[in-house]
Amino acid sequence: MKNIGRIVLPIIILLLTVRINAVPAKAFDMIVRNLPNSEQLPTKELLCIFQDSEGYMWYGTEGGGLCRDDGYTVKVFRSDFKNPGVLENNSVTCITEDGEGKIWFGTKRGAYILSKTDYEIRALADETIKSWTITTMTATSDGMIWISTNRHLFRYNESGERTGKYILKWKGQENTVNSIYEDKKQTVWVTQAKGGLFCYD
């Protein structure tokens, strides 16, 4: 009986391999188009793209600031000689929107909140992250905004007050957070660059 198992199992594996390899590869048509208003962007180097609840497209650029595209024109939010001190750093790394419709965005030196009613930008008041690169951020259905830096994870309410700080370690070592995701059950999942998956419920 043991000999039959030794013979049958390799045959099944062989047949499955042949069957999988016999499936013809399908070609997919991919259409690549330029952004309609790309000539209005301050730079061609985009670090992130986000569509808000009103349908506006937001672009985070490398050195060019935050850009809002309404389909006709691009409005740019950045520090320059006309508007000094708007942002500590003009490289926008990530963008999200909270439940009140405010745009949150991270840069290579801190995080900011933009009000869409008057387009006023204010820096997140948390001194801890003002000089750090923000790697990713996500707004969750409970009104919280999760923000990661290179090795730390922070949670804020929609007013910008910090409600949690987490140091994530995988196999005893701190690691860079590379994504934050909320599933349908409102569980927050966090992945790390060199391995590690964490959940908060």
Model-flagged regions — what are they?
Residues 1-201:
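Carboxylate-rich, polar loop motifs that coordinate divalent cations or form catalytic acidic clusters
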